[in-house]
Curated annotation (Swiss-Prot):
Tissue: Exclusively expressed in liver. Underexpressed in hepatocellular carcinoma tissues.
Lineage per the UniProt record: Eukaryota, Metazoa, Chordata, Craniata, Vertebrata
InterPro entries the record matches: bZIP, bZIP_sf, CREB_ATF_subfamily
Protein name: Cyclic AMP-responsive element-binding protein 3-like protein 3
Annotated positions of the Phosphoserine modification: S173
Source organism, top-level taxon: Eukaryota
Keyword DNA-binding part of the UniProt annotation: yes
Ranges of Low complexity composition bias in the record: 63-85
Primary subcellular site in the record, as a coarse category: endoplasmic reticulum
Its membrane topology: Single-pass type II membrane protein
């Protein structure tokens, strides 16, 4: 129980400390006052070691330098690169110890690893290097590598920690135990168990070896193709690691290229399917277009025929309408003004009738007789005869008086026939002079009456 508690405390302390605090870790373990191992009684060998002066030894110097220099001067670049890294150059990037496989030595027992004594368990040595404990071959029992147990009950005089319980008939298989240097290096990772799990994930233990390199079929093919042979045991050199990373990068590139080609093929297949569907649809549309063009041509022919028929009917109707319009216009201009009830009456306008002298047949006869009488030789000498004129005017039976009355009667009859007798008479009297009326009513001597008749006839003509 005490052993497990001490081991758990030491593991937790190693996990919580950084590599820089290596001195504090040693103080935490071996301090007399507050150390974890202060209650553990050391063997006689440790007491003699205190009293005796330790002689310088190159092995002990290497051990001390590895312990003291691991926290202060860690190597700037790791000797191995992470397993999942892609880069061929591993010197520039620091690596996590949980991704780096621990170095393993050959299958034979090194100088620092001593065989187990009879009756005692496997021993752990503080000598720097690999601490693989070897026992006699026997039945193998697989023990998880993540569990680290250290028995602190007994210290051997030689400075080795040995278990008290006797060896079982079944021995443990060869496995890699952790040294103080591994504990110090594992402090930077933060988890000792993850370190072992990561190493066991990348590598697998082989028969008689601590670790074995596992290659896939593709990696083996590429290595054989390039003529490169990698060892099956770890650790690998930097050149071999770069070659392995290069091979794995080629495999990843090949897989990505295959994926891209697959996607490209699927895309091209989809495009070809769409193109075939579009081609079929295009052909169907072309057939429809040809059918529609034929229908359009037939409709255009029918439209032309209809336009010709409409033009002919329109010209005929226009001619008929023109004729009818001309007839109606002529009828309106010629007939309507004559029958219009609102038009002015021509008979009522005073300007339509002009005064005209009308001579009766009697007057013409009298004038002709007078002209004939004046032309006979030996007629009466001309001269005024006022008495005779007066007598004629006064006597009612004289021919002058008869002519005057007949002229007045004829004028009255003619005015009664024309509906406007008074107006015609007035115009006639105004047109005739007073002298002419006096001459007609009371003519003078025969010469004067004949001359007056000729003048009247000349005026009439």
């Amino acid at each position: 129980m005490n052993t497990d508690l001490a081991a758990g405390k030491m593991a937790s302390a190693a996990c919580s400390m950084d590599p820089i605090d290596s001195f504090e870790l040693l103080d935490l373990l071996f301090d007399r006052q507050d150390g974890i191992l202060r209650h553990v009684e050391l063997g006689e060998g440790w007491g003699h070691v205190k009293d005796q002066q330790v002689l310088p030894n190159p092995d002990s110097d290497d051990f001390l330098s590895s312990i003291l220099g691991s926290g202060d001067s860690l190597p700037s670049s790791p000797l191995w690169s992470p397993e999942g890294s892609d880069s061929g150059i591993s010197e520039d990037l620091p690596s996590d110890p949980q991704d780096t496989p621990p170095r393993s030595g050959p299958a034979t027992s090194p100088a620092g690893c001593h065989p187990a004594q009879p009756g005692k368990g496997p021993c752990l040595s503080y000598h720097p290097g690999n601490s693989c404990s070897t026992t006699t071959p026997g039945p193998v029992i697989q023990v998880p590598e993540a569990s680290v147990t250290i028995d602190l009950e007994m210290w051997s005089p030689g400075g080795r920690i040995c278990a008290e319980k006797p060896a079982d008939p079944v021995d443990l298989s060869p496995r890699c135990n952790l040294t103080v240097k591994d504990l110090l290096l594992s402090g930077s990772s933060g988890d000792l168990q993850q370190h072992h799990l990561g190493a066991s994930y990348l590598l697998r233990p082989g028969a008689g070896h601590c670790q074995e390199l596992v290659l896939t079929e593709d990696e083996k093919k590429l290595l054989a193709k390039e003529g490169i042979t990698l060892p099956t045991q770890l650790p690998l050199t930097k050149y071999e690691e770069r070659v392995l990373k290069k091979i794995r990068r080629k495999i990843r590139n090949k897989q990505s290229a295959q994926e891209s080609r697959k996607k490209k093929k699927e895309y091209i297949d989809g495009l070809e399917t769409r193109m075939s569907a579009c081609t079929a649809q295009n052909q169907e549309l072309q057939r429809k277009v040809l059918h529609l063009e034929k229908q359009n041509l037939s409709l255009l022919e029918q439209l032309k025929k209809l336009q010709a028929i409409v033009v002919q009917s329109t010209s005929k109707s226009a001619q008929t309408g023109t004729c009818v319009a001309v007839l109606l216009l002529s009828f309106a201009l010629i007939i309507l003004p004559s029958i219009s009830p609102f038009g002015p009456n021509k008979t009522e306008s005073p300007g339509d009738f002009a005064p005209v002298r009308v001579f009766s047949r009697t007057l013409h006869n009298d004038a002709a007789s007078r002209v004939a009488a004046d032309a006979v030789p030996g007629s009466e000498a001309p001269g005024p005869r006022p008495e005779a004129d007066t007598t004629r005017e006064e006597s009612p039976g004289s021919p002058g008086a008869d002519w005057g009355f007949q002229d007045t009667a004829n004028l009255t009859n003619s005015t009664e026939e024309l509906d406007n007798a008074t107006l015609v008479l007035r115009n006639a009297t105004e047109g005739l002079g007073q002298v002419a009326l006096l001459d007609w009513v009371a003519p003078g001597p025969s010469t004067g009456s004949g001359r007056a008749g000729l003048e009247a006839a000349g005026d009439e003509l």
